[in-house]
Amino acid sequence: MTQQVFFRPRPDWVGDVIPYSDGGELKLYYLHECRREPTCGTPWHLVTTTDLVHYEERGEVLPSGGDGAEDFNAYTGSVVRDDDGEYHLYYTANNPGRLAPDGRSLQLVAHATSTDLVTWVKHPEDTFGAPEGYDPADWRDPFVYRDPDGEGWSLILAARHSEGAERRRGVVARLVSDDLRTWRPTAPLWDPRRFITQECPELFRMGQWWYLVYSEFTDRFVTRYRMSRSPQGPWLAPERDTIDGRGFYAAKSAQWDGRRIFFGWIASRQDERDDGRWLWAGTLAALEAVQAADGTLDFRQPREVLEAYSQPDYHLRAPLRMGSAERYESAVLTDVLPRDVRIEADLEWEPGTREISLLIRTDSEGENGYVLRLEPALSRMVLDRWPRQVHGTEQWHISGDVPHFIELERPIDLAGRRAHIDVLIKNELLQCCVNRSVCLSASVYDHPSGRVGLAVLDGAATCTRLDTFLAS
């Protein structure tokens, strides 16, 4: 089965993605989430793409080991190729019935090999757990790479010290090997003493900089990165250290076509409601990392994805100016947006303007729907909605004191008083990018249809471009 732009193996879901670049083809291994009881275990499935637009499902490639096996759940890992052309897959082996001394289930590093990246042979004799000093229940997401300072191999993974402050034991542990089978611990790659742990770590080089990418759920559920001139650190925090918001998690990357492409999952919500709690796993999506002059990374939708929506649907014929220094103003188009559409807009605003918004799937009054709101004074963009959560029958029984989807905000420099906005909407999936540098992704359910519009609060703005495009 082939899907366009996004991928989900319906009726199931995509968990963590493990990208591997195989020439011009990207092999995207992913944790297959079935959400059935009794649980079916977690296998690796494979989907491939050669253009970031069309995704071809290849099915299961690394099965669950079965009810009694150490790898009943085959969780996140990585793939590398050795000097002889053999491929090595490292993954997290877990069985809820096999417990550590503290009563939590053990996590182990397991190994498999292949000659074609599709048929994998497991090597249970190579499985190993956490060494002394590390928590045996947090030993996951192995990422293997050739040691840039030597002739061997390094393996980093999400780990925790066995002692210390409960919420700050997280460490990116590191092991080394000469043969890709026997591993010995060495000094951690990064020991920030800040997070519960740093999930799905990966390391790559771009130009003169090295980047350490990880996902965390301590301060926020988000994928972050650090940067260094050396693969050993020190690891510096850029001003904007996140890849996306709460709705795009466990992002990992591969080099493709001379570019760095990240793949994560847009999180789903319980009962497919905007008020439903976030769930693990969702729909696969891609973002491209672009290196700025100072080494920091901007993120945007790949051009191939945007170009997949090239059939004109609506075009704003003349600039639209709106606003007032003392009130809110909005304007809404007449036609209902298609369910699968790209929106492109250019906005400019006067100094001191408080809010500039793109209304998405809104009603004719611009009242009910979703809002991508730019807030220059706060240097942020947020995804909002109306109505917010209703918890009673009275007029004031709404979450009016919750200013937006609280997890869905991104820092952004809006001092230039202009913004280029790219929005992709495909059924319940929403992916926004401002100035081709800051992205915000989400699943949205409560407003399945509506119009596009613009709004301004306490100031004035001009929309110089507003176009919508259908899939080609």
Protein language model regions, located:
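Beta-strand scaffold of nucleotide-dependent catalytic cores
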Residues: 263
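Extracellular glycan-recognition regions
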Residues: 2-5, 36, 243, 257-260, ...
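Beta-rich carbohydrate-recognition and catalytic domains
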Residues: 1-141, 145-200, 205-245, 266-322, ...
